[in-house]
């Protein structure tokens, strides 16, 4: 459950962020993702719920199930007591991989998912009160994509 206060009115929005916690906890998936990031090579199937994208990019049932509706849901994800720290940790680990392109480390199409996810969260964190929160996501953009955000994600956020 997340509370949003647009124009001074209280609105309660249920983003069902627990779907991400359940997916990450299932079978130790998040721990496996961390181990893969530390090894410098992604092998498992966890991108959708560790590095989620904005809705409108993926067309598979899994991509749609784990898509974020926009900046408000991305901010709620960042503020979540489990998901926010995990996302930042995963982004830090991704940025710290010593060698390899995004395609070499993540494979295709997960390299595209990574770019769109960190673009979304850099924008969500950068528009919050603490702009420093975006640094971990821009570090991933710098490391793999010459600092260039994903244009399709930016278009969907407009």
PLM regions with names:
Residues 2-31:
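Extreme N-terminal tail/first-helix region
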Residues 14, 19-21, 117, 121, ...:
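N-terminal targeting/disorder module
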Residues 56-62, 123-136:
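Short helix-capping/linker segments at secondary-structure and domain boundaries
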